[in-house]
Regions:
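Class I S-adenosyl-L-methionine
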Residues: 209-242
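A short SAM/SAH-binding and catalytic strip from SAM-dependent methyltransferases
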Residues: 151-166
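Conserved class I S-adenosyl-L-methionine
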Residues: 79-90
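A short glycine-rich, Lys/Arg-flanked "PGG" loop and its adjoining helix->strand segment in the class I
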Residues: 168-179
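Conserved beta-strand signature within the Rossmann-like core of class I S-adenosyl-L-methionine
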Residues: 180-188
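N-terminal auxiliary segments of SAM/dcSAM-dependent transferases
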Residues: 1-34
Length: 242
């Protein structure tokens, strides 16, 4: 049993997704934690899973892993042969889903130290290495490790569009994938709308338009529920690098 209780606030007005928060009761003390304060959430063992998987029904790790597996197999290939770079890997829930489907080699990158600590604490057998830092400016040993790997697939789940991972970081990770490699990610549906003006959305539209991403499948689905119980639609994309 976890040593905490987590409550969702009673919200009359709609909070934007990057303003959402929960109330954590731990050791008799209550504190408010924003959903995007990942370091705080990862520091409490089991809080991320309780909050996002249990209470808010987050389905993205399973969705991306399933769609990627389906497309790889449709192409006559095996997920067991993939060497995955999981960008914005968090506490390893995406990597865990990929492992369950037969992926044998995974390396993680996240800018948040607490994310790496949580993955090593809770899912120590998922990643071969877990590097902490900005992938576009990693320490030399981490950069050398990634360069020496035969990365064939990039995954980036629930980490794009709110400033969590900037376009430059996504491009740096994309550059590690060879021709014919796989790219699987998700993004809030409105971020792909031209009217949003999001730099990342503009990058994705550009990469699809100029052929740097050849989309194999694209699916709109419910990423999770909001604190008020509304469905949050996201778009999952599995593509190949030409």
């Amino acid at each position: 049993m976890p040593g905490f209780v987590v409550h969702l606030p009673e919200v009359d007005e709609g909070l934007s997704q990057d303003q959402e928060y929960c109330l954590l009761v731990e050791d008799g003390r209550e504190r408010r934690i924003r959903f995007h304060d990942y370091g705080e959430i990862y520091s409490v063992r089991g809080l991320y899973e309780k909050l996002f998987a249990d209470l808010l029904k987050c389905s993205s790790p399973e969705m991306i892993a399933t769609l990627l597996t389906e497309e790889v197999e449709r192409a006559g290939e095996s997920v067991a042969d993939l060497h995955v770079l999981d960008l914005g890997a968090g506490n390893g829930m995406v990597g865990e889903q990929l492992r369950a489907r037969g992926v044998e080699r995974l390396v993680a990158v996240d800018i948040i130290e607490e994310a790496a600590d949580a993955a090593r604490r809770d899912r120590p057998d998922v990643y071969e290495r877990y590097h902490v830092g900005d992938i576009s400016d990693l320490p030399e040993d981490a950069a050398n490790d990634l360069a020496a790997r035969d990365i064939t697939c990039l995954t980036c789940v629930a980490a794009l569009g709110f400033g969590d991972i900037p376009p430059a970081a996504f491009l740096a990770a994309y550059d590690l994938v060879p021709s014919g490699g796989w790219v699987a990610f998700n993004i809030k549906d409105t971020f792909l709308d031209k009217a949003t003006g999001s730099a990342f959305a503009a990058l994705i539209r550009e990469m699809i338009g100029d052929g740097r991403l050849r989309v194999c499948t694209q699916r709109t689905y419910t990423h999770r529920l909001s604190v008020s119980g509304d469905k949050l639609p996201y778009v999952a994309i599995v593509a190949r690098k030409p």
